[in-house]
Amino acid sequence: MAWKWIKAFVYLSVCVTSALGDDEEASASKCADFNNTTWLEYRQATKLQVQYLLLTRKNANCASLFTQDCLNHTQKHTAYFNSSLPTKVIVHGYRALGSKPSWVSGLAQALLREEDVNVLVVDWVYGASFAYNLVVENYKEVAVQISVLINQLTKYGSTLESFHFIGVSLGAHVSGFVGTLFHGKLGRITGLDPAGPMFKSADPFDRLDSSDALFVEAIHTDSDYFGISIPVGHVDFFLNGGMDQAGCARSRFASMYGYVICDHMRALHVYMSALNGSCPLIGFPCSGYEEFLAGKCITCDDPFNGTCPQIGLLKNSGITATPLPNQEKVYLLTTASGPFCAHHILVELNVSRLDKTAEVQLILKSIGHPETELNLKLYTDETRYKTVAAHPEQLCKIDSMQLINTGGRFYRQGDIHFEYICISEIPQTRGMDPLCVKNIHIGRGVPWSHDFVQVC
């Protein structure tokens, strides 16, 4: 299935080249830029070409080409690299048409705003383009070349622990193999939807794995197509179950690019949003997504000692438990568009026993924000229900709640009596009590609503 999607992506990319990135030449200044390649150049290439672009707060808007000559200070702009600072290494993945990735600048700028660091961007477009199976054959050689540079940097004062690799798709496995070459002594690796095709059944030695760095995290958003479905880090964030992201409906053909790659690239965009500090994006440990949605995993007590892991740059994703967990799956919900901030609202209902199955719609409203709609099915043999929903605002900013008895399609649905409905935000914090309404009676097609008066 994934191979079919890769072929479709290559075909559709021909139609949407402009959407893949800015292909304009670098300005007349001496700013370095990504390589671009064509099919003819790719066929004629005799060896893999890798180059490195350096960005720091001193040259945040004008990347410099970084080579081993830089380490000998034979180039004027080499003073930008500061071995006493941490170094973020960005590694892109598969490039279908040989174009530079359009997102690199945004990610680098977000990292520099957050911390005073060196940002090294690995440009291996020449080896990452066109035939995916051949690209996979190249990834270890790319990792070897990167490791040579890292080894040189350690001789000039950098430490292995100071390196944080951020790999997108196939770039996650490149980063992982660099970590393997350094026996897991790199400081951190972040895999943004690590590639799945040709890696799902691979040995841990040949893919990203928790042994590749002191701390490895991964964000999964397309595990049923381009991304890997298994946990590969100390902690693995599965956004919206790790597949079928909100706002990436496959039924729409308005954007062919979005149709093919939207889910896969959501990990990157959510990560960048987390760096921009829009809101805390925290995950809950759970055995599965359905169990999480059913409200069975509402704390982070085990194995995180009550501190939920958070996407971003906190040390070890905010995990304070020792030893670190391994391949721990955590789940979280997001909204359909940036900044993807979602507050996890636990909805608990107690219903008087029914004669027939029933269907209701629950709507949570916050002024100035999209509504949250939940469609719930109620059964004759159950009276208590729990579910988790994503809402764009915190609990204390929910202004009203509405219930609609939507009825059955092929039979007349009777009235429904709710003993109570409670909504609360998870993880629960001190001073944030649940909002509860008792003794609710709704007839078919007659909306019921309740307004909350709150001040955050």
From Swiss-Prot:
Bilayer-crossing regions: none
Molecular function in Gene Ontology: phospholipase A1 activity
Catalytic reactions of this protein: 1-(9Z-octadecenoyl)-sn-glycero-3-phospho-L-serine + H2O = sn-glycero-3-phospho-L-serine + (9Z)-octadecenoate + H(+); 1,2-di-(9Z)-octadecenoyl-sn-glycero-3-phospho-L-serine + H2O = 2-(9Z-octadecenoyl)-sn-glycero-3-phospho-L-serine + (9Z)-octadecenoate + H(+); 1-hexadecanoyl-2-(5Z,8Z,11Z,14Z-eicosatetraenoyl)-sn-glycero-3-phospho-L-serine + H2O = 2-(5Z,8Z,11Z,14Z)-eicosatetraenoyl-sn-glycero-3-phospho-L-serine + hexadecanoate + H(+)
Chain positions carrying an annotated carbohydrate: N35, N36, N72, N82, N276, N305, N350
The protein's Enzyme Commission number: 3.1.1.-
Domain of life: Eukaryota
Keyword Phosphoprotein applies: no
Active site: S169, D193, H264
Entries under Pfam families matching the protein: Lipase
Disulfides per UniProt: C248-C262, C286-C297, C300-C308
Database matches in SUPFAM superfamilies: alpha/beta-Hydrolases
Annotated signal peptide: 1-21
Record-level GO cellular component terms: extracellular space
GO BP term, pick one: lipid catabolic process
Family: Belongs to the AB hydrolase superfamily. Lipase family.
Role noted for this protein: Hydrolyzes the ester bond at the sn-1 position of glycerophospholipids and produces 2-acyl lysophospholipids. Hydrolyzes phosphatidylserine (PS) in the form of liposomes and 1-acyl-2 lysophosphatidylserine (lyso-PS), but not triolein, phosphatidylcholine (PC), phosphatidylethanolamine (PE), phosphatidic acid (PA) or phosphatidylinositol (PI).
Record's protein name: Phospholipase A1 member A
Organism ancestry: Eukaryota, Metazoa, Chordata, Craniata, Vertebrata
Record gene name: pla1a
